[in-house]
């Protein structure tokens, strides 16, 4: 393994990296950073969770001259969540060098951003629409930009941002360095590389390095109407510290988070229809641990990097295998272990096989727990906690009452009563979940997407009137007259911008109504006993 000290970074950046607890570079970091420090253009192919933010962030920050009061680098990201997350990460890494980082995105008052831009940030992290808006307002000038980063370029293609990206790249000096990161390399991304990059170094993390060995992956065959009871039993048995539950649509997220609360679980949901303030509030509570279960759509969860997520539950199977990889990448981060569960209805076995082909890994089958198993699982967890308390805590103040209880009752009865008090009893509160149609495999596994984004994600073809593809439902965020690309750059029919102060997304259709493809048949899977999770 390569250490960060071997990569030629400045002392201030090494100080930040070491204070964050990192010593060894990941493969994408070890291969990217030396070339980037030499000023070379980079094409990096890597999935989420491989450390690519630091791979481009460290050389980007290393290049900044903090004595200059101008924007020297821009990072373009597909979603506001990812822009915020990248901005936070760059701030941590650049803290000791005193680099000023400014995220700009839809959903935030643009006048507030204009005031912040007047304070001369060194690096801008933002979504394409909002960056271009500031360029055209003359509130963001890029004449001194030396480095441009395109993060998750294929996602920006799928969301319809290619024209915006080209417009931004045209506005920066020709001598700039470009660092482009993308999980896949469809033709439109290759054309951008050919047009705006000079002899780029192509760095690709091998598939075996992105299959997330720290994550235990299980699938459960379960009927649609039984999913919720299976989920609650798993939550009771596994008692996750922090869990993310993925639903395919906004309706599903709303109904599922409400149902979990009715059954006594601290849960909240996020999706594209929430205001930015509400979404940030929910995420803050989740990070702080005041809610234990976050229910999310694929779109809303893009770019989330929340430490301590122990479990990911795929309540609805994702529309494509790449989304599955992004989903489970929310756990098992920074060397920690994680558990991912995938609920598969009888008609979705073909999609399960597509996912396994993409990840190059067979999932273990887990039997859906019964009610009795859920109760026993809870009790065993409680017993472990009691044993840990006996071994590690001072119980002197509690023994007198304990002795009095044992004079009147036998020890087994006392322990049984304690277990009963601490065990969550079965809850029969009625809940209502609208059934979602199954995702039926279209055959042939995952396909590379072309220039129009292709594919279906979150169950919506999402095409505008002129026939251009919105791609994966992660949303071009356009309605029929072309509005709402990233929740802030709204266009009316004549092309003028409607500058919404709230910048909020008006109905992300990509998280909308499910629309399955045609079946290519069902595959039979070998039955295995359920491992302990």
Curated annotation (Swiss-Prot):
Gene3D superfamilies: P-loop containing nucleotide triphosphate hydrolases
Catalytic reaction list: ATP + H2O = ADP + phosphate + H(+)
Keyword list, A-Z: ATP-binding, Cytoplasm, Helicase, Hydrolase, Nucleotide-binding, RNA-binding, Stress response
Matching SUPFAM superfamilies: P-loop containing nucleoside triphosphate hydrolases
Compartments in which it is found: Cytoplasm
Binding residues for ATP: 46-53
A GO MF term: ATP hydrolysis activity
Disulfide bonds, paired cysteine numbers: none
Effect of a null allele: Longer lag phase and slight reduction in growth rate between 20 and 45 degrees Celsius, no growth at 10 degrees Celsius. At 15 degrees Celsius the unusually long cells form large aggregates and are curved at the pole, with incompletely divided, thickened internal membranes. Decreased growth in the presence of H(2)O(2), diamide and at acidic and basic pH.
Inducing stimuli: More highly expressed in lag than stationary phase at 10, 30 or 37 degrees Celsius. Induced at 10 degrees Celsius. Encoded by a monocistronic operon.
Motif (Q motif): 2-30
Helicase C-terminal domain ranges (all copies): 214-374
Residue ranges of domain Helicase ATP-binding in the record: 33-203
Motif (DEAD box): 151-154
GO biological process, one term: response to cold
Annotated stretches, region: Disordered: 428-533
Pfam families in alphabetical order: DEAD (PF00270), DeaD_dimer (PF25399), Helicase_C (PF00271)
Basic and acidic residues: bias regions: 458-512
Biased composition (Basic residues): 524-533
Any one of the GO CC terms: bacterial nucleoid
UniProt EC number: 3.6.4.13
Uppermost EC category: hydrolase
Subunit annotation: Oligomerizes, may be a member of the RNA degradosome.
Function: DEAD-box RNA helicase possibly involved in RNA degradation. May work in conjunction with the cold shock proteins to ensure proper initiation of transcription at low and optimal temperatures. Unwinds dsRNA in both 5'- and 3'-directions and shows RNA-dependent ATPase activity. Probably has a somewhat redundant function with cshB, as cshA can partially complement the growth effects of a cshB deletion. Plays a role in adaptation to cold, oxididant and pH stress.
Family of this protein: Belongs to the DEAD box helicase family. CshA subfamily.
Name of this chain's protein: DEAD-box ATP-dependent RNA helicase CshA
Lineage: Bacteria, Bacillati, Bacillota, Bacilli, Bacillales
